[in-house]
Amino acid sequence: MARDKIALIGSGQIGGTLAHLVGLKELGDVVMFDIAEGIPQGKALDIAQSSPVDGFDAKFTGANSYEALDGASVCIVTAGVPRKPGMSRDDLLSINLKVMEQVGAGIKKYAPNAFVICITNPLDAMVWALQKACGLPHNKVVGMAGVLDSARFRYFLADEFNVSVEDVTAFVLGGHGDTMVPLVKYSTVAGIPLPDLVKMGWTSQARLDEIVDRTRNGGAEIVNLLKTGSAFYAPATSAIAMAESYLRDKKRVVPVAAYLNGEYGVKDMYVGVPVVIGAKGVERIVEIELAGKDREAFDKSVGAVQGLVEACKKIAPELLGA
């Protein structure tokens, strides 16, 4: 059986980490694409040379032409620029929207049957733009956010309780940013909801609130520590979990930026919600009932995403006709 082809669009820190993980997990052959000549070729060769040591068989190719995407089963998009000091939100949107338009055109032409995972920030707006630009079905285009945000929440909780991360489940909804909504009552340790653990004296509500805040600012914390960029190991690992669920039809229930058309009262927008990912892409959107503060926080998060999408429509009106 022929191996799947995984196209990585953008060969920076996340792209390189993605390529290495695809090899280690033997998910398929890898094409690394970037507009910078030599970078994807060099990284692809470097990772390929690690395969005899780690014992995985996969072909790694670097390319500067979208033709290399031809027939890809999965495309993971990290292309774009990070927000730099002094750069306004609209500056960032303007640059990365152009990138999404180019990438979308490349995917449309060469990989129309792919499952597409967007990682480029601002995530919820970029995945919306990418879907408009490539024209692929909504269930085949998603954004990587919730898996990462939930992983951060799970790690902080496991650290707090001194238990295995495997026994912690966490639930994060909403946009990928400081308005995300970590849902405490749906997060558990070995099936025991966090509010019960507070009653049991494992932690306090105040401490839980601190962990929720730290989760919201998880990305910024790493940016401030690194000073030269943003997180790449955990984001790449999160995207690979999504790709693996698609390629192997695992039907995992994971939070992703998914297209909503009425679910959660949201229309024509990508927002972080739990979904089932299988061989057909997003096979089901899991719609839970939100009330009180959770609903309020979710609506606020959706409002923040809507603001970004409206800004995108003004900057790149051509996307609406795509």
From Swiss-Prot:
It comes from Rhodopseudomonas palustris (strain BisA53). Catalyzes the reversible oxidation of malate to oxaloacetate. Pfam families: Ldh_1_C, Ldh_1_N. The keyword NAD applies. The gene is mdh. It is an enzyme of class 1 (oxidoreductase). The active site is at 176 (proton acceptor). This is Malate dehydrogenase. GO terms for molecular function: L-lactate dehydrogenase activity; L-malate dehydrogenase (NAD+) activity. The keyword NADP does not apply.
